[in-house]
Amino acid sequence: MYHVRTFNKELQPSINSSLRLTQRPAAENDIPDYLNGTYTSRPLITVAREIPMKKEENELVDVLIVGAGLAGIGSACQLRRRSPELSFTILEARAVSGGTWDLFRYPGIRSDSDMYTYSYGFKPWVNKSAIADGGTILEYIREAADEYDLNRHIRYNHKVVSAQWSSTDNLWTVTVTRSDTQSDNEEPLIIRCRFILSCSGYYDYDQGYTPEFAGIDDFQGEIVHPQHWPEQLHYKNKRVVVIGSGATAVTLVPTMSEDTASLVMLQRSPTYIVNVPGEDPWLKPLGKFLPASWVFRFIRWKKVLLQQYIYRLSRKKPKALRRFLINKIREELGHDYDVDTHFTPNYNPWDQRLCAVPDSDMFAAIREGRAEVVTDHIDSFNSKGIALKSGKQLDADIVVVATGLKLKFGGDIAYSIDDKEVDVTERFVYRGMMLSDIPNMAMSVGYTNSSWTLKTDLTAKYVCGLLKRMNRNGYTSVTPTIIDKMGEVPLLDFDAGYVLRAQDIMPKNGDREPWKNNDKYTKDFVNLELKRNKHSELTFR
């Protein structure tokens, strides 16, 4: 049996009305409430999920969400909240949801942003921990998916390979491969959709970044990358060296050092590290007389404004902020500790991301002698450990290569428009989410100087607004279109290694709005939330 919503036939594109949607028979309780009834405002036929069809027939959905991580689940929740009349499918390349928070399983994994701004705006963070561990975040994401009945919309082991736009049909034809099938000869799955929302993250899930170290094959111990932490790795009473000084390294060090015989964090150069309270000081006082949701909103906006103040201070008075941060570290470690060598970076604050440590756990590990920081360059690996250019030898049983990520733009999807390949590096970014001259496609990309989710949440709501306008006016496409010539500026004002290594795969950034990527949440909140009906330089058809 097919469950079909009917629309004005004059507005329907020329497609098969028989559409395969899933691979198991539909039950009555499989059909969500919002599929009941007849609509006439949208130019698409929408067929319910979970309906078996012949293999050669293609399925059609209104919105195809790529990725079931933090951004993908949050975006789908916003679709359910704001556009319940739209059909959608979530394609996830991995076997489970959660994205980063399921993939990374190294000891002590936690957020490097406060959870009041990292959580969804529509789902208050009620845990007392301002910096949460990975398992708690994963539980939060999956709880949101349960609350909004998303799980039956998710297809796991489905990787998007390419997407072809047809200006005749005003639809995307998306090619998907599956990694859970027995046959290597199975043809790719074809899905057609009205709009693509890419929430696939910004890095390569399959492989982290590891520099080429001389002699690494000579090392007789274990070498691990945090992105693929061995489940059975035993480090108790072992000598461990952690290479790196970013968020992953400063998370690993205090946790692992509780059990290791010795632990050295080996860094080429220092990073700014900031102590933050594990529990927000306003939580208990406000919680005595305000509802939890009100407390959440208050602390969330307090955190937003504080983040922006610190970032703006780093741009306007970098020396003053630098001095403040370094003095705070001296207070933690004492004036006898060599802060100049190990905790004084050679760049200004927020040229790279600040690393937050809750309740001084990193500094406590150093004070208590459980961990040591060595600032030096690697000459080569040898059978016993690492030889440094200073001549020092670091013997180790385990070396953790916490050297960063490999960026991957848009999930490596090959886009084409009317059979012409799209080079995304030649396209300009529109409002931090769409690309010039590419119709009906948006990317969910967060901030580098603030919590990631603040921007992805705004993006999802803005896309819902676009789709509502299209439905209301009978449009079938929306395309960012550059009206006047403009200059080009770097897309990310950020000197992190993983960003610099990926400059050649990034799209362009204009020197004027709405083509200039914004790094200020309050400004985006006004432009995308409060003024969401003002769609300058968008072409609707």
Which residues fall in each region the model found?
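Beta1-alpha1 glycine-rich phosphate/pyrophosphate-binding loop at the start
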Residues: I15-L19, R24, N29, D33-Y34, ...
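C-terminal, flexible cofactor-proximal segment of oxidoreductases
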Residues: N16-L19, Q23-Y39, P43, A249, ...
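Core beta-strand elements of the Rossmann-like FAD/NAD(P) dinucleotide-binding domain
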Residues: V61, D184-F195, K236, K389-I398
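Short beta-strand to alpha-helix junction loop
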Residues: W125-E143, L313-L321, P349-D361
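Feature captures the FAD/FMN-dependent oxidoreductase FAD-binding
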Residues: A130-Y203
